[in-house]
Amino acid sequence: MISSTALPTAATKPPSVPPSIERLLLLPLIALPILWLAGYFFPPINHDVAAILDVSARWVNGERLYVEVIDENLPLTFVVHALPVLTSKILPGDPSFWFTAWVVAGIFASFWACRRLVKLVPSADHALTEALLPPVLLFLFTVLPNEHFGQREHILFVACAPYMIASMARGEGILLSRGSSIAIGLVAGVALAMKPHYLAIPAALELYLLIRRGWRTTLTDPIPWAIGLVAVAHFVSMYTIFREYGEFVMPLAVEAYAPIGDTGWRGVLTSNVLAPTLIALVIFGLIAVIFTKTAAARVLVVFGIGAAISAIAQAKGWPYHVLPALSAAILLAALTVRRRSTATCRSAAAAITCRWR
């Protein structure tokens, strides 16, 4: 008979992988998306992005926004897109190049922040999670957008990813530092305020966190206040700094936007763009909530629901509208894979131990 003392038990830790080997295995997952980013510097740029950059350039060059150059997009959209235009006046390169450069810089900044924030989520305190989620996020930032790179939905997800992961930590009782919370809220707020539909995301998230944490914790959390501050300041600017937009352009935009396309929100629900995303969100959301049993998974589901509501509210069914919701569904799948992989490994170790006892 083989002695059980010579064999590993369920409590025995598997042999650890040297850090150098781990980094080597993760290298392709990090390097390939970075190489993919290089392709975005070659023309053509996304046509919607090009149109917004053109309006921003005319505004920066002296034309009066909403008077001499009229566009239905909100003022903050042109403020954000004025940054690459202004950069091109200081440094070599045209606005489209610097737009791509600024988005790429934002991707790396968001990726760095997300890697740090993942370590604060108690239920994500696992080597596989810390190894898997950042490369998946980098894939969602770089490869998934493809021809929609730079669309506001893409910028939204990149800017809100730290807010999303911070909310996963907040949902599990973690309090972030005041400085980090304000920075996360302000960055997310700028992206969320570029379209009114986007505000469905923080509305859903903060409502869930309010129910889970109560009024006291919610009212002392700087993140929703920072987001709200940006949204309110933007709204006020529509009737002060950009008065022509609030008084004349916005009523015309509301009237003109609805007839664009012939789908409507009911058609969007069953379209070949949103319907698969909703199905994936429901399936992976249920699996994640049932198998992981964590507040972080539920927060991620709520983020996806808010993003889906945003896409439905736009009532167009355009592919890039679902990018944030689709990204949430993919992250839910990654989160579930990690949890089930861990459980499977533990079950396998226990089974082997029992076999040889």
Kindly label every feature range from the protein language model.
Residues 3-5, 18, 201-228, 290, ...:
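Perimembrane helix-loop-helix junctions
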Residues 54-57, 70-93, 101:
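Short hydrophobic/aromatic helix or loop-helix immediately within or flanking a transmembrane segment
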Residues 101-124, 162:
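Transmembrane-helix motifs of polytopic, lipid-linked glycan transferases
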Residues 111-115, 119, 274-307:
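Hydrophobic, aromatic-rich transmembrane alpha-helices
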Residues 123-126, 155, 161-183, 280-296, ...:
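Membrane-interface transmembrane helices that cradle and orient dolichyl/undecaprenyl
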Residues 159, 200, 314-348:
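Hydrophobic/aromatic-rich transmembrane helices and adjacent perimembrane loops
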Residues 178-196, 202-207, 304-313:
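Membrane-interface alpha helices of multi-pass inner-membrane proteins
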Residues 220-261, 270-280:
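Membrane-lumen/periplasm interface segments of specific transmembrane helices
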